Regions:
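TRNA-recognition modules of translation machinery and tRNA-sensing kinases, especially anticodon-binding
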Residues: 1-312
């Protein structure tokens, strides 16, 4: 008899004898987070679509091409329909949850972690599935560069406890809206001069958000981006000072890092510090953890101005 249905493309089953591996990773993640003062939070698998459009960014690939959205009719005649989306990442849902549940009215900083499934409609390949699983953590209420360093240290500890070796830490600052405006002008002027060489997606990005071109995986676009203006040359005094202090904290903690000005991350909410832990053995999908600061997101979602940072 033929199988009625198979698992959806880009998903996976975990056989009983393999589940222990998942338990091991999840246990180490929870133990590491709690050692650093983080508490577990849980939030829905789906949220109002507007949450992700507002936070992740209307022009990002995640929102434009990869989100699983559904319209739920709330009445018999189809009026008053609600738009929902399966979460493509965890930061937006966690931020919404801490605002709605009043955690930011309690003692700060608030530190939460989560172990969740996320969903993106992208081409399945090695290291990229349409349903994937994340360990993430968020800290709300500290603007200090030392908080960035502590978050990076926690990720490093977790990776070491997993026994993963040959990992490189890349860091960058993408500034704030104030200094990024001048950088966008310089970046757009540079790529405009080579527009016809860019891939079709990056020609669209040039009009909407030229920083996204730096994140393109096309070898041609990567080669063009090698000589592009560097964000570190455009940082305001506050952002530059923050980044220099972060490096000093990492040096004091004996955490090795590489400054990589091409790291911009793929989501619009990031400000100042961004970082990635990259495996030197996996290849094109070598980033095993990414994160950074997003000081404007809480206010953007309707909360009081609150500095924040996180990773997944």
């Amino acid at each position: 008899m033929a199988l009625i249905a198979q698992k959806p493309k880009g998903t996976q089953d975990v056989r009983p004898e393999e589940v222990y591996k998942w338990h091991t990773v999840e246990k180490l993640a929870a133990e590491t987070a709690e050692c650093y003062g983080f508490k577990e939070i849980r939030f829905p698998t789906f949220e109002n679509t507007k949450l992700f459009k507002r936070s992740v960014g209307d022009t990002t690939d995640v929102v434009q091409k990869e989100m699983y959205s559904v319209t739920a009719k709330s009445s018999a005649n189809g009026k008053d329909a609600d738009d929902f989306a399966l979460r493509p990442e965890g930061t937006a849902g966690a931020a919404r949850a801490v605002i709605e549940n009043g955690l930011l009215n309690e003692a700060l900083p608030q530190k939460v972690y989560y172990l969740i499934s996320c969903f993106r409609h992208e081409k399945p390949q090695a290291g990229r599935l349409r349903e994937f699983h994340q360990f993430g953590a968020e800290m709300y209420g500290s603007a200090l560069p030392s908080a960035d360093a502590d978050m990076i240290a926690m990720v490093k500890t977790f990776i070491e406890r997993l026994g993963i070796k040959d990992i490189v830490l890349n860091i960058n600052s993408i500034g704030c809206p104030k200094c990024r405006a001048e950088y966008h002008k310089a970046l757009k002027a540079y790529f405009e001069s080579r527009k016809e060489e860019l891939c079709g997606t990056c020609r669209e990005r040039l009009e909407k958000n030229p920083m996204r071109i730096l994140d393109c995986k096309s070898p041609i676009c990567q080669d063009i981006a090698k000589d592009a203006p560097v964000i570190l040359d455009y940082l305001c005094d506050d952002c530059s000072g923050h980044f220099e202090k972060l490096k000093k904290h990492l040096d004091a903690m004996n955490i090795e890092y590489t400054v990589n000005p091409k790291i911009v991350r793929g989501l619009d909410y990031y400000t100042k510090t961004v970082f990635e832990f990259v495996s030197t053995h996996i290849g094109a999908q070598g980033t095993i953890c990414g994160g950074g600061r997003y000081d404007g997101l809480i206010e953007q979602l309707g909360g009081n101005p609150t500095p924040a940072l996180g990773f997944a």
